[in-house]
Structure formats: C-alpha cells, structure tokens
C-alpha cells in the first residue's frame, strides 16, 4: 500500500529537501569511512559493509536508512557469510525492509552526496 505519494512543498512550490542533521552526518561519515577503507585496502566494498546496529549507534533512524536506500545513496543486503569465509557474502535487496543481519554500503551516488553533506557541515561549523 502506497498512500504517501505527497511530499512537503516549500513556499516557492519546490519540494523541500530533508534536513541533514548531525545524526545523519555521523552515519554518512561512518559509511564514507568504510568506503574509503575498502578502496585503500583494495578490498571488495561489501567486505566493509556496516551492520545496521552500528549505524543506529550514530543516531541514524530506520527512516534515515530507508531514505538513503530510496534515494539510491545506500545499498543494503542480508549478510549470509559463514565464519572462516575469505570474504563476506550478502543477499542484496532494493526493498525498504531490513532484518537483523542487514548491512549497508554507500553507492557511487551516495559517496558524492556524503562528501557534499560532510563538507557543508565542516564549512558551516
């Protein structure tokens, strides 16, 4: 059921952008750091995917995560790895339902978004 097709609209008639608060910035910073570590190590990005509970610890909410996925800033998958496997394994999903073993990575679009959001917060602070 999708009844929430309406968006908030500002006085100019433009769709209002969501507030990028400190919790979202902290989550983006953690996801971006994992992305950079994977690149630096020459590893598969998914080997550095972050478990959702670590993202919740930054103050991210389930709505934040759903928004990141819906905007295609983040990808997610259910981890199906076994102890001792040389690499982590995931069952990828595009949906907005997450299970306890869901992990997240930034997409290329998300890396760009995170860089801008974090740069803006540094310039403002």
Q: Language-model segments: which ranges?
A:
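Short amphipathic alpha-helical interface segments
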Residues: 2-70, 77-78, 93-102, 114-121
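Short, intrinsically disordered terminal segments enriched in charged and Pro/Gly residues
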Residues: 124-125
């Amino acid at each position: 059921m999708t009844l929430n097709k309406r968006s908030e609209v500002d006085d100019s008639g433009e769709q209002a952008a969501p507030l990028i608060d400190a919790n979202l910035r902290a989550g983006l910073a953690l996801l971006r750091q994992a992305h950079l570590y994977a690149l630096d190590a020459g590893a598969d990005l998914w080997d550095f995917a972050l478990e959702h509970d670590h993202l919740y610890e930054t103050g991210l909410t389930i709505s934040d995560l759903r928004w990141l996925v819906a905007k295609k800033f983040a990808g997610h998958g259910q981890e199906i790895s076994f102890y001792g496997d040389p690499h982590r394994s995931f069952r990828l999903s595009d949906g907005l339902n997450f299970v306890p073993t869901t992990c997240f990575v930034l997409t290329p679009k998300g890396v760009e978004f995170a860089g801008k959001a974090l740069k803006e917060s540094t310039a403002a602070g």
